[in-house]
Curated annotation (Swiss-Prot):
NCBIfam families: L_thr_O3P_dcar. Its EC number is 4.1.1.81. Gene3D superfamilies: Aspartate Aminotransferase, domain 1 (3.90.1150.10), Type I PLP-dependent aspartate aminotransferase-like (Major domain) (3.40.640.10). Pathway: Cofactor biosynthesis; adenosylcobalamin biosynthesis. The modification N6-(pyridoxal phosphate)lysine is found at K213. This is Putative threonine-phosphate decarboxylase. InterPro entries: Aminotransferase_I/II_large, CobD, PyrdxlP-dep_Trfase, PyrdxlP-dep_Trfase_major, PyrdxlP-dep_Trfase_small. Decarboxylates L-threonine-O-3-phosphate to yield (R)-1-amino-2-propanol O-2-phosphate, the precursor for the linkage between the nucleotide loop and the corrin ring in cobalamin. One of its GO terms (biological process) is cobalamin biosynthetic process. It is an enzyme of class 4 (lyase). Its cofactor is pyridoxal 5'-phosphate. Disulfide bonds: none annotated.
């Protein structure tokens, strides 16, 4: 970003506050089962008369046990977004490679640091999958790599073996790599994709995760990152103190022990993904792209998302206009996977746009 240049506002999902009435929020990719019941007991135990432990020792111990690493490998933050910005700032990234469309905060973090990312377009014809051979080639132009795995808004992932090849290339170039795994726990076969086992082999690998997405509590901002002790120490030097409040710390200490909730969520969400994809693909004016996580990218074969969003809002449904993601336009929108009854409301509302004349019937739909 050039000196004196103003940054355009970056909009995110979950912004129900701009709209009136009770809405079913399909714009925010949060666990449809909601937070575990015991969370309220954990919150009651918070002592607001004291600062949180500035080193977050007990919280880091809980995370370390969950992911299988040492406390020295962990940093915590006010959501994954804080850690993404911290990474860009600590490594002074000016031109990292960002396969796109992707989470908007990657780009924003770099531009706020005075940089301009190198972009690699994820092709619709390839299902928006990350072509790691193209990444290997394009990374020659970059001073870092920021990769969503699974990626938002496309819902696609890259397997660990391919990540390992990317890391070897990055190591030869002596550049840092951030892999954002905010949604990885929703994946049915997540162990094939997670990069955590690679942290011990690569000093400049930083893996970021978000607690609030999978555990259904975006109001409690909590994220964590895993890296080598030297990388974590470097990030801590740039980090503001006490960015994780007492509520988030208390909940986080217990969250990762609830294995039943974790498995129940993964099973429920993946069953709903299959149901939603099947149902959405019966609607002629839509293209529903494959996904491995709790959201689905959709493309209109006719019309614009503005028309669809306006009509759905009148039915009490909020979707995510995806046109502000790089390389996407007004034909694209994203919906979260929610509870069955809510998902059916969305499906029926989208089908109903035929009858209302908002969308053309199947005889007049063109790709």
């Amino acid at each position: 970003m050039k000196e004196g240049e103003k940054m355009k506002p970056y909009e995110h999902g979950g912004n129900i506050y701009d709209y009136q009435g009770n809405l079913i929020d399909f714009s925010s990719n949060i666990n449809p089962l909601g937070p575990p019941e015991w969370i309220w007991e954990a919150i009651k135990e918070v002592d607001l008369s004291r600062y949180p432990d500035i080193k977050y020792r007990r919280l880091k111990e809980a995370i370390a046990e969950y992911v299988g690493c040492d406390r020295e490998n962990i940093i915590v933050g006010n959501g994954a977004a804080e850690l993404i910005h911290l990474f860009a700032r600590a490594f002074k990234l000016k031109k990292p490679l960002i396969p796109s469309p992707s989470f908007l905060e990657y780009e924003r973090a770099v531009k706020l640091n005075g940089g301009e990312p190198v972009y690699l377009k994820l092709e619709e014809e390839e299902g928006f999958r990350v072509n790691f051979a193209k990444v290997i080639s394009k990374i020659e132009e970059a001073d870092g790599l920021i990769l969503g795995n699974p990626n938002n808004p496309t819902g696609q992932g890259i397997i660990r073996e391919e990540i390992g090849i990317l890391l070897k290339k990055a190591e030869l170039m002596n550049i840092p790599v951030l892999i954002d795994e905010a949604f990885i726990e929703f994946m049915k076969d997540y162990k094939k994709y997670e990069a955590l086992p690679l942290v011990k082999k690569h000093d400049k690998l930083f893996v970021v995760r978000a607690v609030t997405k999978f555990f259904g509590m975006p109001g409690i901002r909590l994220g964590y990152g895993i890296g080598s002790p030297s990388l974590i120490q470097k990030l801590e030097e740039y980090k503001e103190p006490w960015t994780v409040n007492a509520f988030a710390e208390a909940v986080g200490r217990w969250l990762f022990k609830d294995r039943e909730y974790i498995e129940k969520t993964r099973e429920y969400v993946n069953a709903e993904i299959e149901h939603m994809l099947f149902s959405l693909r019966t609607i002629d004016y839509l293209v529903a792209f494959d996904t491995k996580v709790n959201f689905i990218l959709l493309k209109l074969k006719a019309g614009t998302v503005d028309e669809v969003k306006e009509k759905l809002l009148k039915k009490g449904i909020l979707i995510r206009d995806a046109s502000n993601f790089r390389y996407l336009d007004k034909r694209f929108f994203r919906v979260a996977v929610k509870r069955r009854e809510d998902n059916m409301c969305l499906i029926e509302a989208l089908r109903g746009l035929y009858e209302e004349g908002v969308m053309p019937d199947k005889e007049r739909v063109v790709v």
